Amino acid sequence: FLNNRYIARMDHRGHKYEEIVSISNLFSCWQEFRKNKAVREDIMEFERNLEDNVFRLHEDLIAERYEHEPYYKFHIYDPKHRIISKATVRDRLAHHMIFNELYEVFDQSFIYHSYASRLGKGSHLGVANVARALRKSSLNNARTVYALKCDIRKFFDSVDHRKLEQIIQKKISDHRFARLISKIIGSFSKTVDNFAQRERERESWLSP
């Protein structure tokens, strides 16, 4: 789904691991990551010893001994109940570093109306395009139109990690970078009371 010119550019870039995990790149990623977050307690705590933390992360990454720390889980109600898994600042910095490398590789494959975490997109453009589509479909409010609000239940909990890794690794030439991504994907594990397990139990209970 990527044009040949872009594939050639991507292969030339090569996702060189040493450049990705370099000190300079990590500090650059930190400046991007901390935007609009500088007053958060966990960000300020990490920044108190910023150089030590970044150098330690770099050393772990370059030696391939990086291990993802446990996620902090908390509950929100907006209005439905959801359990949120939040990584540490150190790990979120590593996530941001990886995001920067993968963004251009996959952005061109997304449909136009995918708005989250994309340059030049976002919720404001999404709302504006919905309003434009409603005006067009309703002939400038001359007729009634309907919109279906829907969501994929437990989407992230149900993602097949093996298939996700296969999709990503097809676009990456550096094996060390691929191993790092696989390690981070594998860091998220569902609890015993996960969606798939509960669905199997429900189907079993409903079976005659």
Q: Where are the model-predicted features located?
A:
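Non-catalytic, polymerase-adjacent accessory regions of viral genome-replication enzymes
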Residues: 1-55
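Active-site-proximal segment of RNA-dependent polymerases
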Residues: 16, 103-160
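Reverse-transcriptase-like RNA-dependent polymerase core
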Residues: 25, 57-80, 93, 100, ...
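Short coil/turn segments at secondary-structure boundaries
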Residues: 42-46, 68-75, 108-115, 142-149, ...
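Conserved, non-catalytic sequence blocks in retroelement Pol enzymes and Pol-derived host proteins
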Residues: 46, 118-119, 204-208
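Conserved polymerase palm-domain catalytic core
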Residues: 53, 60-61, 133, 137-208
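Conserved pre-motif C helix in the palm subdomain of viral-like polymerases
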Residues: 81-111, 198-208
